[in-house]
A protein has these predicted regions:
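Canonical Radical SAM [4Fe-4S] cluster-binding loop centered on the CxxxCxxC motif
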Residues: 1-4
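Acidic, carboxylate-rich catalytic segments that either coordinate divalent cations
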Residues: 362-365
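Generic structural signal for secondary-structure transition and capping sites
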Residues: 18, 121, 149, 194, ...
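Short Fe-S-cluster ligation motifs
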Residues: 8-28, 313-360
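Radical SAM enzyme [4Fe-4S]-AdoMet core and its adjacent flexible, acidic
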Residues: 95, 99-107, 114-235, 242-258
């Protein structure tokens, strides 16, 4: 990404934001560490200088393979939020994360994790669950705790653009397998004497604490809540995974260029307007049909597009697993008292909380 593009991002995206709504800049898509740490140090400084206002927040999602002293210094200096892509034990991780020479990357990733731990830099792990992962809840839990990793989020393997199909779509018992995995992982969290932070548990905890009339925020269906900038300055919004996908009807989801302006340049795009209208129809359909709408907010446009081939559809496998089954499974665990007397802080609860959440979503219906 050129300095010209960085300056345009600062001028057209960052500077217009009110001081109390400074954006989080997420460096993602591909592997951000293919560029040297020195490049990011200059880029961060340029964005600060050109964008004005309070300090920006930055986040990296990385495979951690290249972590060294330079990266440690960068992330510590700029207080960067670090996410590491790590799929559990070596055999699971290496089955889909390989080096350019075709070798497994697990050992290299763990070397990076060790360096982060030695430096005292906090990080979280994102683990992609494949069909092969679903029977391995204990192995995955034991691996993470054995490595001193206690902050994990699960993504399910998705159908995304030209990346190929998800192994979960080819598994007829995927719902049962995912439910079984999550139940066992929740059990392990509950009986562990040390706290284990799992996004899926804490997400439901947040729903239980929310006001009864408050629908879950879904930034992916609201235009411009997320703005994605490609390496050449192409602008997109909605789901970040959309940019670059082949979609002639939507100009491959490139709705403008940051060098030509910010949000307004996207508003002027016919392709953006078509996508926005179609996504809105999909959200309305979800609201009309789905008893989980209050806790989902209309699904992820990228998953609808890649699974269904359209934005105005409703349920996807991604939604069924990560929203519906996750909610039901965690609420079942709460109702069963799985987290009573647990080390998981904040899950000592009035039993009416989970029952009330079922009433709000209709998820008590079977």
């Amino acid at each position: 990404m050129s300095d010209e593009t960085l300056r345009a991002i600062a001028r057209n995206i960052i500077a217009p934001c009110p001081p109390d709504e400074r954006p989080l800049v997420v460096w993602h898509g591909g592997e951000p560490m293919t560029l040297p740490a020195a490049w990011y140090a200059q880029a961060f400084a340029l964005l600060e200088e050109e964008g004005g206002g309070p300090p920006l927040r930055h986040a990296f999602q990385t495979n951690a393979v290249g972590v060294n002293a330079s990266w440690i210094d960068l992330w510590r200096t700029w207080k960067v939020n670090i996410g590491v892509s790590l799929d559990g034990p070596a055999d699971l991780h290496d089955s889909r994360r390989r080096t350019r020479r075709g070798k497994g990357s697990h050992a290299l990733a763990m070397r990076g994790v060790s360096r982060l731990q030695e430096a005292g830099l906090p990080f979280h792990v994102i683990t992609v669950l494949t069909a092969q992962s679903l029977s391995r809840a204990d192995d995955i839990y034991d691996f993470f705790t054995g490595q001193g990793i206690r902050n994990v989020a699960f993504n399910v393997e998705e159908e995304e653009g030209q990346e190929g199909g998800s192994s979960l779509l080819a598994t007829s018992q995927v719902a049962a397998g995912y439910t079984s995995f999550l139940k066992q992982f929740l059990h392990r969290c509950a009986v562990d004497p040390e706290p284990f932070h799992c996004r899926e548990i804490e997400g439901v905890k947040g729903l239980l604490a929310a006001p009864h009339d408050q629908r879950a925020e879904n930034w992916q269906v609201d235009p411009f809540r997320i703005v994605t900038v490609g390496v050449q300055g192409g602008l997109s919004t909605f789901s970040p995974e959309l940019i670059g996908a082949t979609a002639p009807d939507y100009d491959d989801f490139v709705f403008g260029n940051v060098r030509d302006g910010g949000v307004q340049s996207m508003r002027d795009s016919d392709a953006f307007r078509r996508a926005s209208d179609d996504i809105a129809r999909g959200v309305a359909a979800c609201a009309a049909e789905c008893r989980f709408f209050e806790v989902c907010g209309g699904g992820a446009p990228a998953n609808k597009y890649f699974e269904l081939g359209r934005f105005d559809g409703t349920e996807t496998l991604h939604c069924r697993l990560t929203r519906q089954i996750t909610l039901e499974t965690v609420l079942d665990a709460l109702d069963a008292g799985v987290f009573d007397h647990s080390s998981q802080e904040g899950f000592l609860h009035d039993r009416s909380g989970s029952a009330d959440q079922r009433a709000r979503t209709g998820s008590g219906q079977r």
